Amino acid sequence: MSQEIAVIGSPDFTTGFRLAGVRKFENVPDEAKDDELDEAVTRTLEDEDVGIIVMHEDDLDHLSRNARQSVERSIEPTLVTLGGSGGASGLRDQIKRAIGIDLMDE
């Protein structure tokens, strides 16, 4: 079964993905993130057609502790964050979490 990419974030963040063909998205305006982001993440986590969730790194700060733990611990769908200050180490942690080993370990 083929799974899709879903994008969660502000309309400015999701628009580029939508133009690139991503069909599943949750628009949450910046001023509503504290109230609506948890619900958007929960809906997306429960969608069996989604294999990857893309969010902006800074949006994780708007999630409740439970929602943040759920999305960070989720194997399928896998969370990929962009932006923020995580940089290469953030990507390294995401890969390690997804496959269970550190490919860059010496």
From Swiss-Prot:
Q: Which GO terms describe its biological process?
A: proton motive force-driven plasma membrane ATP synthesis
Similarity-based family: Belongs to the V-ATPase F subunit family.
Protein's recorded name: A-type ATP synthase subunit F
The organism of origin for this protein? Haloferax volcanii (strain ATCC 29605 / DSM 3757 / JCM 8879 / NBRC 14742 / NCIMB 2012 / VKM B-1768 / DS2) (Halobacterium volcanii)
Q: Do you know which Pfam families this protein is assigned to?
A: ATP-synt_F (PF01990)
Assembly, in brief, is: Has multiple subunits with at least A(3), B(3), C, D, E, F, H, I and proteolipid K(x).
- Where are the disulfide bridges? none
- Lipid bilayer topology: Peripheral membrane protein
What compartments host this protein? Answer: Cell membrane
Q: What does this protein do?
A: Component of the A-type ATP synthase that produces ATP from ADP in the presence of a proton gradient across the membrane.
Which InterPro entries does the entry link to? ATPase_V1-cplx_f_g_su (IPR008218), ATPase_V1-cplx_fsu_bac/arc (IPR022944), ATPase_V1_fsu_sf (IPR036906)
